[in-house]
């Protein structure tokens, strides 16, 4: 017998979020003895892992193909934008990974050479990664002569800056009604199942 029956009541895509309304029907009395709803909410908001840009390294190549590392306050004449705003845009990129990776760290690469504009689509991603961010334009350049390489370290972790879950509401009556909002890097149903795995209840779940 399944401890939990999950019924999807509503799901939709909002402007920059995914929304899900579900009912969790609890079939066994022992689940009533747990602070079940609050536990799930706490796990959803604090324990869900996700990938995010953690470190950015920028390398500038000169005409002799010698490269050196520059920082966000370096003045680069060929770049219209300042590098600080460029790095902020890179840090805010939202990624979706379609397969579970064994590692908690991977890399993406952006090559800037002979372009006047650089877009999100120019980023070379690891296999099975997709960029979800909407703002496509990253940086504008004054010259085709510049040669930059930008290395993005993607780190998988949990906490406010990483968590795909933006908001969780619940009402507990005989059953539990959950409203879950995510930033699209994971679906609400995916994170709900992950939360049940953490407390080892996914094997008792019927959808």
UniProtKB/Swiss-Prot annotation:
Q: What cellular component GO annotations does this protein have?
A: chloroplast; DNA-directed RNA polymerase complex; mitochondrion
Task: List the catalysed reactions.
Answer: RNA(n) + a ribonucleoside 5'-triphosphate = RNA(n+1) + diphosphate
Location(s), subcellular: Plastid, Chloroplast
This protein's major location comes to plastid
* Record bears the keyword Transcription: yes
Keywords in alphabetical order: Chloroplast, DNA-directed RNA polymerase, Nucleotidyltransferase, Plastid, Transcription, Transferase
Looking at its record, which EC class is this enzyme?
Answer: transferase
Classify the source by domain of life. Eukaryota
GO MF terms listed in the record are:
DNA-directed RNA polymerase activity; protein dimerization activity
* Enzyme Commission number(s) from the entry: 2.7.7.6
Which example biological process does GO assign this protein? DNA-templated transcription
Describe the family membership recorded for this protein in Swiss-Prot or TrEMBL: Belongs to the RNA polymerase alpha chain family.
Task performed by this protein: DNA-dependent RNA polymerase catalyzes the transcription of DNA into RNA using the four ribonucleoside triphosphates as substrates.
**Subunit structure, interactors included:** In plastids the minimal PEP RNA polymerase catalytic core is composed of four subunits: alpha, beta, beta', and beta''. When a (nuclear-encoded) sigma factor is associated with the core the holoenzyme is formed, which can initiate transcription.
Q: What is this protein called?
A: DNA-directed RNA polymerase subunit alpha
Organism encoding this protein: Euglena myxocylindracea
Which gene is this protein's source? rpoA
């Amino acid at each position: 017998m399944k401890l939990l029956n999950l019924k999807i009541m509503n799901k939709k895509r909002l402007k920059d979020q995914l929304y899900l309304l579900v009912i969790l029907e609890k079939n066994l009395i022992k689940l009533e003895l747990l602070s079940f709803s609050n536990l799930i909410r706490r796990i959803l908001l604090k324990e869900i892992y996700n990938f995010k840009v953690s470190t950015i390294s920028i390398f500038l190549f000169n005409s002799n193909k010698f490269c050196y590392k520059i920082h966000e306050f370096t003045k680069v004449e060929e770049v219209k934008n300042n590098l600080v705003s460029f790095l902020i845009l890179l840090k805010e990129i939202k990624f979706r990974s379609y397969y579970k990776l064994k590692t908690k760290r991977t890399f993406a690469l952006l090559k800037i050479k002979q372009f006047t504009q650089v877009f999100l689509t120019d980023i070379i991603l690891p296999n099975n990664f997709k960029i979800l961010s909407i703002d496509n334009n990253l940086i504008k350049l004054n010259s085709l002569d510049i040669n930059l390489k930008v290395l993005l370290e993607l780190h998988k972790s949990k906490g406010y800056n990483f968590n795909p879950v933006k908001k969780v509401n619940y009402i507990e009556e005989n059953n539990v009604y959950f409203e879950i909002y995510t930033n699209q890097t994971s679906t609400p149903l995916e994170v709900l199942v992950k939360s049940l795995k953490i407390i080892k209840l996914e094997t008792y779940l019927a959808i």
